[in-house]
């Protein structure tokens, strides 16, 4: 493929997993809406899907819409599978430094909160990120995005949260916007000022309350005025920000016009799932991690989903695996309860240094019991809904953005089967080829 055209016809697919039909939950999450056959093709015009189906039908649709087949660049899928471009709905894209030392400490028994309390964990990355230049952070972001693209990811949520002061958080959001302008990928910026209490507050007797006041009174107004962040996230967890503090921050964010999401119940039942359900009416899109939700939290998320205000449970199995956990988020309980489930990398230097959604899918199938079709829905259409983009990306149907991956195999089942590998032939973004493995 040349990469210069926005009008593209991919022919000869063995199957196309369209994920058409919107957000998946319950039994519907296992339906990838797959079209089979060696003559299935996808047509993109002007950066959007024009038609998908049997080759003769698609050709007729192209001509019926007044287009000439000669106007399309053609690409032979050679019997491979076509899926929507993958959507990574939870990443910490911009940071400086690595944390392999604490990884080794954890292997010897040190706990996450123990490392954080000693100034490690998030705080060590905050110090390194504050000290890094703009160009250093941009270079790291570019490298990571390139690796993600090569693994099939075309849309990426990117959080701030490694500065924890007004100027630094604004800088991270601005750098995210700059990367979005230069990258073929779509970046969705999230403000995460409430990621941890920074070192300069920790000597105070009221450290957490004082920092919550700073997030609400200083950081949020500046972020809203900047106009880059689309949503606000909070680390709602015992020992970080409790349910009451998280509610205050997220309510203020909603008043500022931001969508809501939260790190919820990662380490222990902390009321995060319940809070996410409570805030569904204020625009809460997702509750993430959920490795240790309460039964009440699962039920609350199921109720709002049934009521038509779904909050997506965005699960992060690579994090649990990298931390050496012996339990993972109860994905089957969420799906069986009718809660829509997404998967994401949680890319970050401390607890999930992975850039591969296919690897995340593999872990989810092995450790959480998801089927390959459920896992694919979780990194496409459901992940898109977790970002408020369900009407734009995440499925292959007319009018949707033409974000596509052509794989070197023909079945959905093989996608998580190839552990740690991404046998990709090509990645297309808005109808343009942006990656091709030769």
Regions inferred by a protein language model and the residue ranges of each:
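Histidine-centered catalytic micro-motifs
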Residues: 84-96, 160, 259-267
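C-terminal cap of metal-dependent C-N hydrolases
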Residues: 27-32, 379-381, 398-438
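Alpha-helical scaffold segments that flank or form the walls of functional sites
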Residues: 41-43, 80-82, 99-158, 174-181, ...
């Amino acid at each position: 493929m040349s990469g210069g055209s926005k009008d593209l016809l991919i022919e000869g697919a063995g199957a196309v997993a369209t994920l058409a039909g919107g957000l998946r939950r319950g039994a519907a999450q296992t339906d990838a809406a797959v079209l089979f056959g060696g003559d299935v093709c996808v047509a993109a015009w002007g950066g959007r899907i024009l038609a998908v189906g049997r080759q003769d039908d698609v050709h007729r649709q192209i001509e019926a819409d007044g287009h000439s087949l000669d106007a399309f660049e053609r690409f032979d899928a050679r019997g491979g599978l076509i899926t929507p471009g993958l959507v990574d709905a939870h990443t910490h894209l911009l940071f400086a430094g690595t944390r392999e030392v604490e990884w080794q400490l954890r292997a010897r028994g040190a706990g996450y909160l123990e490392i954080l309390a000693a100034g490690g964990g998030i705080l060590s990355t905050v110090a390194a990120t504050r000290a890094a230049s703009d160009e250093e952070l941009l270079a790291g972001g570019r490298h990571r995005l390139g690796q993600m693209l090569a693994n099939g990811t075309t849309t990426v949520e990117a959080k701030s949260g490694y500065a924890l002061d007004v100027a630094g958080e604004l800088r991270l959001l601005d750098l995210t916007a700059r990367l979005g302008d230069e990258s073929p990928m779509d970046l969705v910026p999230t403000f995460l000022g409430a990621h941890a209490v920074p070192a300069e507050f920790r000597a105070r007797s009221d450290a957490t309350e004082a920092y919550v006041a700073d997030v609400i009174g200083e950081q949020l107004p500046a972020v809203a005025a900047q106009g880059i962040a689309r949503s606000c996230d909070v680390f709602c967890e015992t020992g970080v920000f409790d349910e009451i503090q998280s509610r205050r921050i997220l309510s203020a964010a909603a008043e500022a016009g931001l969508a809501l999401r939260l790190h919820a119940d990662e380490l222990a039942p902390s009321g995060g799932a319940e809070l996410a359900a409570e805030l569904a009416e204020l625009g809460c899109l997702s509750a993430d991690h959920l490795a240790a939700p309460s039964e009440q939290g699962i039920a609350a998320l199921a109720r709002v989903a049934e009521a038509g205000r779904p909050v997506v449970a965005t699960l992060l199995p690579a994090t649990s695996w990298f931390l050496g956990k012996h339990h993972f988020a109860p994905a089957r309980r969420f799906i069986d309860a009718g809660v829509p489930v997404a998967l994401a990398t949680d890319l970050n230097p401390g607890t999930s240094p992975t850039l591969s959604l296919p690897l995340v899918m593999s872990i989810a199938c092995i450790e959480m019991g998801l089927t390959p079709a459920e896992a694919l829905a979780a990194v496409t259409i459901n992940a898109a809904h977790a970002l408020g983009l369900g009407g734009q990306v995440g499925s292959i149907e007319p009018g949707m953005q033409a974000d596509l991956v052509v794989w070197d195999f023909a079945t959905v089942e093989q996608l998580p089967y190839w552990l740690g590998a991404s046998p990709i032939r090509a990645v297309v973004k808005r109808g343009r080829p942006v990656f091709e493995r030769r």
